[in-house]
């Protein structure tokens, strides 16, 4: 497996990966901003391809390839510490638990999205992507990596636990349009040492 930086040509696949990793939240956000006649995936793809101010901009992604084929990707960022003040009254109710957990992760490197394409799952590639994400976190100067996972996503939860991640906090998932998930959102973290 080889890793490389994301390019504008990856935007279509990255939009699918981001939505899969985000369990439909990205698609819902994109639906709010798509203009008439534009699909929400088209909006999301264009945002990843061209919005260099956005966290999900293609250059912020690491792409995993096997035999020159994209098999998965991830991106993350260092969470500001102190965390910026947020007026929760201006946020959608369903989004608040995610923001609260991100605030708890202040100072860590937050793995915002990670996913392996379906045809490559079950072969250990997620562990390799996770290890590379930990390298990126260390390179950012932090000693802790964090991530959010829905408890209903048992496969991901088992992967993170088996790789040394532990629960730090949890919040109840508030359903949003497009959502079919229930349960809690779990903030997990791992100390990376020196």
Protein language model regions, located:
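Conserved GNAT-fold acetyl-CoA-binding loop/helix
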Residues: 24-49, 60, 84
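A short helix-loop-beta-strand connector motif used in the catalytic cores of GNAT acetyltransferases and
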Residues: 48-63, 79-84, 110
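C-terminal "cap" of GNAT-fold acetyltransferases
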Residues: 93-94, 143-146, 150-157, 162-163, ...
């Amino acid at each position: 497996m080889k890793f490389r930086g994301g390019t504008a040509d990856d935007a279509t696949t990255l939009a699918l990966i981001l939505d899969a990793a985000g369990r439909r939240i990205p698609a819902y956000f994109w639906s709010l901003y798509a203009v008439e006649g534009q699909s929400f995936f088209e909006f999301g793809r264009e945002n990843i391809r061209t919005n260099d101010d956005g966290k999900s901009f293609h250059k912020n992604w690491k792409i995993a390839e096997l035999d020159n084929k994209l098999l998965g990707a991830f991106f993350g960022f260092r969470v500001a510490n102190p965390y910026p003040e947020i007026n929760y009254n201006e946020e959608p109710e369903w989004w608040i638990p995610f923001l609260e957990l991100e605030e708890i992760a202040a100072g860590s490197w937050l793995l915002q999205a990670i996913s392996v394409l379906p045809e490559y799952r079950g072969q250990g590639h997620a562990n390799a992507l996770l290890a590379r994400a930990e390298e990126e976190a260390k390179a950012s100067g932090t000693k802790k990596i964090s991530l959010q996972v829905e408890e209903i996503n048992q496969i991901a939860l088992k992967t993170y636990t088996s790789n040394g991640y532990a629960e730090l906090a949890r919040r109840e998932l508030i359903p949003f349009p497009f959502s079919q998930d229930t349960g809690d959102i779990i903030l997990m973290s791992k100390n990376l040492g020196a």
